Amino acid sequence: MTTSGCNPMKSSSTSNPTIGFVSLGCPKNLVDSERILTQLRMEGYNIVPSYNDADMVIVNTCGFIDSAVQESLGAIGEALNENGKVLVTGCLGAKKDEIIQVHPNVLGITGAHAYEEVLAQVHEHLPPSQTHNPFTDLVPPQGIKLTPRHYAYLKISEGCNHSCSFCIIPDMRGKLVSRPIGQVMGEAERLVKAGVKELLVISQDTSAYGVDIKHRTDFWDGRPLKTDMYQLAAALGELGVWVRLHYVYPYPHVDNVIPLMAQGKVLPYLDIPFQHASPTLLRKMRRPGQVEKTLERIKNWREQVPNLTLRSTFIVGFPGETEADFEELLGFLEEAQLDRVGCFQYSPVEGAKANELPDPVLDEIKQARYDRFMQLQQRISTERLKQKVGQTLPVLIDEVDDEGAIGRSYADAPEIDGCVYLNGDIQVKPGDIVNVQIEHSDEYDLWGTRV
């Protein structure tokens, strides 16, 4: 059984009903899973790691791209075969007919972040125990977490107001709905008190935080705070832990958080999905297209924060992409010198506006462009990591085994970026932040010795 947390908190009571849980997709989906699991535990349900031990299985699905849809349908099928009683939630739940066509025997289907609906369906098909004792089935103040104890994802909003032509997230998760900043800060405080050393701020669009509620003023720690990205980042920076900003849309006001990085309040790291560098393609994608201004801003950011790490994602082979468009993208990579980059070959997503665009790119051309893109970016990433050799960096330890420790520097987000290897060092533990002198690098990772 594939889960993102096999046994978060199993109750000592053997009479409580049991739930198996499969969590697929992005960190935002993981946070949804944590919230559902927390509420289930508070109601006395046991969370178990195997199909055989579960009275029912919940599958939290992803439906962003076709491969994710197939993975989700496969996970639902596996749960049905192994257990038989399955509830489906998550992004793919927006395509209810598609699920029922393949798996007509599921007990129920809900969409993304439909917490109350999920719980209502659980209650209908598997009522909670009448003997549940909340004093023995305790849940920690920070709730159930599926990440290691020392880092946590902090979701600040749901949905998205953009209409990128290749994306169906607004159809699945709805328009932007920002959480009150006081509520977000309260959760962040609870996580830090529970031992979290790194907060990863996530949403569909972190830089749009508060737009939907006109940046309403809320209160935290007895003082007023506007619901916007800058004030949130500044307040999080007061908690004394690493703060990492993900999924930032390149709005002009992103410039305002750069001084917080220069002051050490927020990690010098920005995750900004540029998607392409050809103005023609960006218009077709319905993305910001002022590439020269973007390059100028990157230059200004690095003047203020020389050690800034920039992560981005790009799409090659988008409908209508010419060789000239692709060359513009390669030129952008050379000039921008981004640190961490992901690249995807365009594939149609059911329901996306881009499906209606003419001039699809042949698969062999997509593959060739992807290979050229990755070859160039690997060279850039290798050169940028080589500049860290000889430096001493703070490293957050993630794992320790007989061969040594593995951690991450400020430049590395979990799961998607590189690692720092401390070969032979077993005198540290996960969650420690130690200083490491960097001795070696490759295109993705660093090696060093604790000092």
Curated annotation (Swiss-Prot):
Pfam families referenced in this protein's UniProt entry, alphabetically: Radical_SAM (PF04055), TRAM_2 (PF18693), UPF0004 (PF00919)
Primary site of residence: cytoplasm
GO molecular function (one): metal ion binding
Enzyme type, top EC level: transferase
Residues annotated as domain Radical SAM core: 146-383
Cofactor annotation: [4Fe-4S] cluster
SMART domains given in the database record: Elp3 (SM00729)
Domain TRAM per the UniProt entry, residue ranges: 386-451
Positions that bind [4Fe-4S] cluster 2: 160, 164, 167
Localization terms from the record: Cytoplasm
HAMAP family to which the protein is assigned, alphabetical: MTTase_RimO
Name this protein carries in UniProt: Ribosomal protein uS12 methylthiotransferase RimO
Organism: Cellvibrio japonicus (strain Ueda107)
